[in-house]
Swiss-Prot record:
SUPFAM superfamilies, per the entry: DNA-binding domain of intron-encoded endonucleases, His-Me finger endonucleases
Molecular-function GO terms, alphabetical: endonuclease activity
Presence of keyword Hydrolase: yes
Enzyme class: hydrolase
Provenance organism: Acanthamoeba polyphaga mimivirus (APMV)
InterPro entries (alphabetical): His-Me_finger_sf, HNH_nuc, Intron_nuc_1_rpt, NUMOD1, NUMOD4, WH-like_DNA-bd_sf
Protein name: Uncharacterized HNH endonuclease L245
Length: 330
């Protein structure tokens, strides 16, 4: 895909690319993104006023037609950090939710529950809290609170989760020095107090975090380290945990390994070398195609232009290299 830049409407001091980068249109300097609910976001300034936008919505608004006037932007591959225009689509809330479920991005837990009278006599069972609410007319949120032990009764009844469900949910091993949490081999963290799996957050470096409370003090901890400390032996006391496939959100034990700082750096360098084997196109200053190369290494050798400079242009971190425009070819 050829990288294209366009002005951002109402904020013409900025340009956005179809690969999800934003830069100052005058200096060419790329903006740094922060994280908001798992999405990249950035602040744009105009007349001394700042406004924060989700990057994927800006890309969609500028590069993707929306004839049906949908108000939701969907990431096709489920990766919220992949804001390439080819990975985005306008949709509605229903399709967005179905997409998440179909692709395993969101799981539906049908928590079977049982209804009892005040004396503990069995009345009925329901496949889910929502079904119980529809049948009895009782607020599902209140039923949920009763099942979680936050209230004794709801609507004049006692409610409990099915015991089989509870056993299935509470799998995994306890965290080191904190038995209130369980961690599974695939990186899910279960809170015994809340009786549910914790929803992870994504830090600025792309790692998944959860908030762990110890002695009433909350601390954000990387999930990959929790998995490694619980399941993977570390006889040499190595300080780093490496993602073997370089996917920072794949926290399965089969994808993690303890390593030294040097080993971690070597792995990082090896994965970066893949960048130099991607096909690249060369353009003049008017975006006319000059030629293409099988790799950035070849482009650098034949043109005499620094390879890292070509990479920076392809990534949108600078405008030109050797008075040429460059872009990756997918």
């Amino acid at each position: 895909m050829v990288t294209k830049w366009k002005k951002i409407c109402l904020f013409d001091n900025y340009e956005i690319s179809n690969t999800g980068k934003i830069r100052n249109s005058k200096s060419g300097k790329l903006l740094k993104f922060s994280m908001r609910k798992g999405y990249y976001c950035c602040s744009l300034s105009k007349n001394n006023t700042k406004k924060t936008f989700n990057v994927h919505r800006l890309v969609a608004r500028i590069f993707i037609n929306n004839p049906s006037k949908f108000n939701v932007v969907n990431h096709k591959d489920g990766n919220k950090l992949n804001n390439n225009s080819s990975n985005l689509e306008w949709t509605n809330y229903k399709h967005n939710a179905n997409h998440a479920i179909t692709n395993g991005l969101k799981k539906i837990f049908r928590k079977k529950i049982h209804q009892y009278d005040i004396n503990g006599n069995y009345i009925d069972s329901f496949e889910s809290i929502n079904n119980a609410g529809l049948y009895t007319g009782i607020n599902p949120k209140h039923i949920s609170s009763t099942c979680l032990g936050k209230r004794k009764t709801c609507g004049g009844f006692i409610w409990e989760y099915d015991k089989k469900f509870s056993k299935e949910k509470k799998n995994g091993l306890p965290l080191e020095n904190n038995n209130n949490y369980l961690i599974t081999k695939d990186g899910r963290v279960f809170s015994k107090r809340a009786n549910k799996y914790l929803k992870p957050k994504i830090d600025p470096d792309g790692y998944l975090l959860v908030s762990i409370s110890t002695n009433n003090v909350n601390k954000q901890i990387s999930i990959h380290r929790l998995v490694a400390m619980t399941y993977i032996e570390n006889p040499n006391n190595y300080p780093y945990v490496n993602h073997i496939d370089n996917n920072k959100q794949n926290n399965n034990i089969t994808n993690l390994e303890w390593c030294t700082p040097k080993q971690n750096m070597i792995h990082h360098i090896k994965t970066r070398t893949k960048i130099y084997t991607v096909k690249v196109a060369q353009y003049d200053m008017n975006y006319n195609v000059i030629t293409s190369y099988a790799s950035i290494k070849e482009a650098g050798e034949k043109t005499g232009i620094d390879k890292s400079s070509i990479v920076r242009v392809c990534k949108g971190k600078q405008k030109y290299a050797g008075k040429y425009i460059w872009s990756y070819i997918n």
